[in-house]
Amino acid sequence: MAISNVISVLLLLLVLINLSNQNIKGIDAFHQIYEELQSESVESVNHLHRPSFHFQPPKHWINDPNGPVYYKGLYHLFYQYNTKGAVWGNIIWAHSVSKDLVNWEALEPALSPSKWFDIGGTWSGSITIVPGKGPIILYTGVNQNETQLQNYAIPEDPSDPYLRKWIKPDDNPIAIPDYTMNGSAFRDPTTAWFSKDGHWRTVVGSKRKRRGIAYIYRSRDFKHWVKAKHPVHSKQSTGMWECPDFFPVSLTDFRNGLDLDYVGPNTKHVLKVSLDITRYEYYTLGKYDLKKDRYIPDGNTPDGWEGLRFDYGNFYASKTFFDYKKNRRILWGWANESDTVEDDILKGWAGLQVIPRTVLLDSSKKQLVFWPVEEIESLRGNYVRMNNHDIKMGQRIEVKGITPAQADVEVTFYVGSLEKAEIFDPSFTWKPLELCNIKGSNVRGGVGPFGLITLATPDLEEYTPVFFRVFNDTKTHKPKVLMCSDARPSSLKQDTGLLAKDRMYKPSFAGFVDVDMADGRISLRSLIDHSVVESFGALGKTVITSRVYPVKAVKENAHLYVFNNGTQTVTIESLNAWNMDRPLQMNDGAL
């Protein structure tokens, strides 16, 4: 017992030393603060691993997407941005606009710390279009005492489609934490919605000890806000709820999105939260009671760590908005870097936004489905296809005729019989990641693993596989389909640093895919862009984003394969692949 206690104390000291070395402090603990690095100027930008068709500023650090909105013919995206360096710090609201969600023009920054209610930071928030007033920003400001406050900003000229200049009125803040709340964990107001009782409502994330909390605030005039008596929802042991999102989905229309203020009987609500502790997100489907201002999850999936996710990979701080132009709900999300802090500084940039995705309720009514917006297909170039090609155990077939490091690949697999599927161990029911770590792409199975090998060298010294493995769930008598995106073999680079910031993060990511495979088919789409691989299983039922940094499998030296390591022969029923061109404009302008 004494030895055990000594070991525990030593481990605690190591953790504290590690935190101290990383300069993580106070309320900023949810971001790693490198005071000596956050203003280190960028002399040049290294393009070796830089994506070509994903949203990025020309240089420096980017994180949360903020305030996406469609207004007067333009898509607007604001985002957290470091004006001076490639690590987190000096954060402002940068601002870009687009006509097509593909080509982006950078404008002047919208918000930066300047007044007592945000002098310590202008953090994440949303935009609401208020009838008679135009767009209004709700955002989190940090005062000099490091207390988080909710503020608003208005456009100087609401008639300007570009919304170039914003004003922070002196009657801010509009919401402050009361004595029952944690003032250092009170942030990220959602887009507000107008209810039939005459009130506007917004949701703000928080925590009390280890309980994650979403508070609702109400207002009649969008200036004076009052906290509801009870949280709209909370959950023990989930920690701080960052970047909450709350929106309705239709139970009958599986093609169109709904605006926030839609009222109708055939709807469910979605509550998504970003978990500060894990840097993962999860969501539930449920019922929102307007009179009580309470949200009640259905209970069909876990409400907590093991819940459903928008994306099972490197994806965080996501934010949706309703696109009035095409009657759809669109999702943005941040994919951070996975290499070292030193590498980020040397290359002069860090972070990107994933390709925007449409959000719909699946026809099963049990989960959401996500798909890249159709506009991204305008970047498709050279095209190759493959049909009705069998892949036997141990085979891999190269996809030639495109640029594998910058591509869009869609493939439908036919597996036929599932008799050879391995028996599913029920202890992994809520542990897809652990199962993927054990059953990697090189571990032979019955039905699978099969899928794509992306960003690979010919000898597979480096590669990032995205694949399925089908199990037989004897409890449900249905197939259990595992989807993995495994970055462990993605790079030959060896990091020996003692601290996390000095080591490349090369994880596997995984999620189960809810398909019955009655017709023996399953689809996979991967968007490959140098250091990011976004993959969509079964038409978007399961999505995984990986960040990878090959040493050899870069640019024209990267290869793409289809593979099968299962004893069951798998057929490539159809494969369509395209080069992806660069957008004509990617944030050229004010930044």
From Swiss-Prot:
Residues 1-22 form the signal peptide. Its main location: secreted. It catalyses: Hydrolysis of terminal non-reducing beta-D-fructofuranoside residues in beta-D-fructofuranosides. Glycans are attached at residues 145, 182, 336, 472, 565. Keywords: Apoplast, Cell wall, Disulfide bond, Glycoprotein, Glycosidase, Hydrolase, Secreted, Signal. It is found in: Secreted, Extracellular space, Apoplast; Secreted, Cell wall. Disulfide bonds join 436-484. The keyword Disulfide bond applies. GO terms for cellular component: apoplast. Expressed in flowers, and seeds, and, to a lower extent, in seedlings. It is an enzyme of class 3 (hydrolase). One of its GO terms (molecular function) is sucrose alpha-glucosidase activity. GO terms for biological process: nectar secretion; plant ovule development; starch metabolic process; sucrose catabolic process. SMART domains: Glyco_32. The keyword Lipid metabolism does not apply. Pfam families: Glyco_hydro_32C, Glyco_hydro_32N. Substrate binds at residues 61-64, 80, 88, 123-124, 187-188, 242, 276. The active site is at 64. Transmembrane segments: none annotated. Its EC number is 3.2.1.26. Belongs to the glycosyl hydrolase 32 family. This is Beta-fructofuranosidase, insoluble isoenzyme CWINV4. It comes from Arabidopsis thaliana (Mouse-ear cress).
